Amino acid sequence: MKKIVIIDHFSQTPDEPGNNRFLYLAQMLCEIGCQVEIITTDFSHKAKKTRQTDMERLRELPYGFTMLPEPGYPKNVCLTRFYSHYVLGKNLQKYLKTISKPDLIYAAIPSLDAAGAAAAYCKKQNIPFVIDIQDLWPEAFKLVFHIPVLSDLIFAPMTAQANRIYRQADKIVAVSETYKNRGLKSCKKDKEGLCVYLGTDLAKFDESAAGIAVDKPADQLWIAYAGTLGHSYNIEIVLDALNLLPDDMASKVVFKVFGDGPLMERFQAYAQKCKVKVDFLGRLDYGSMTAYLKHSDIAVNPIVKGAAQSIINKHADYAAAGLPVVSTQECPEYRMLLEQYGCGINCDPENPKQVADALQKLLQKEAMRHEMGFNSRKMAQERFDRAHTYQGILAEIEKLVR
């Protein structure tokens, strides 16, 4: 029996809401006969507090689930966070010395501290090291601290750290072609890499949505946003666009916002000026969110100019729900997917009028919504269904541990 260790700094516990890639992968590895342990932190990045976890439930899992101590931090962007990650990395180094040698380590990036500790351990023990790039660090931080030249100098140590990790990987896996190509620039051992979108399990998505009743008035049209309410996401451009809709149309529209984050209160205050009804529903359990998305009419993907995001969770959820998407994301990869499948409208990230025109077109034309929605679901089946796409990850792991 091959022993696989998965290191995911920002994992979720099974009793927390979400649709985590690594829990799903751990389950798949167990089903093919591997012994699996997930190593993460006892600090919840989303809740910004130490986890209160049902340990009995953890013991019932088919894989091990280890939470290492981390001091924590109050905000996504603060110096305390970097120190907290440093401590977690040191605790991971110590913990890896106590376990029996695994056959392979599969580590998520970010964080760089956790992945760096894993890289050092794999080099010393001469075992295969696979990284799965979920986000680009320090590129994501440069969006917040965007000062030409100075930002590059400040984040130079993180860039060097990321390059060292990429260089050592035996295999680069990533959630987008964009991220994969960044890793391959520095990688010495892997020249091809593997792009596997975060995705979702379509069968489970449909089952979850079908099991929850949603009360939607027949005369309403719902525009949905699902995800973090943070610096990379421009909810305000959607609100500005909604204010540009004709009054008779605006009266039928409800903007449903699913999620929370550091800018939630700011967005809620801004929404007070919106002539369209706005519902902030907070972070729902994944099943409830799927049901609401299935009952929605249009999805919005309002990502700010210059953001590092590529293919992300909400893309899979919108596609699985069969929703047409109005997107302000600059990432060529996602823009191309929307155009290739004919399932959305790309807009300028700083042009509310363009967003309003796109929304108005879809709100007016039911046939267009249905056609784009059908195409969106087709994209989910072909590009985002984990039951099929994650087989590629399993194949790479099996190849490395033979």
Model-identified regions with their sequence ranges:
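N-terminal subdomain of nucleotide-sugar transferases
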Residues: 1-60, 198, 240-247
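Conserved donor-binding/catalytic core segment of Leloir-type glycosyltransferases
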Residues: 5, 215-243, 256
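Membrane-proximal helix-turn-helix segments that form the acceptor-binding/catalytic region
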Residues: 93-94, 116, 120-124, 152-172
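Carbohydrate-associated surface elements
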Residues: 178, 199
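Nucleotide-sugar-dependent
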Residues: 233, 285-292, 299-319, 326-336
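Nucleotide-activated donor-binding/catalytic signature segment of Leloir-type glycosyltransferases, i.e.
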Residues: 250, 265-290
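A short, well-ordered alpha-helix in the C-terminal region of glycosyltransferases
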Residues: 361, 368-383
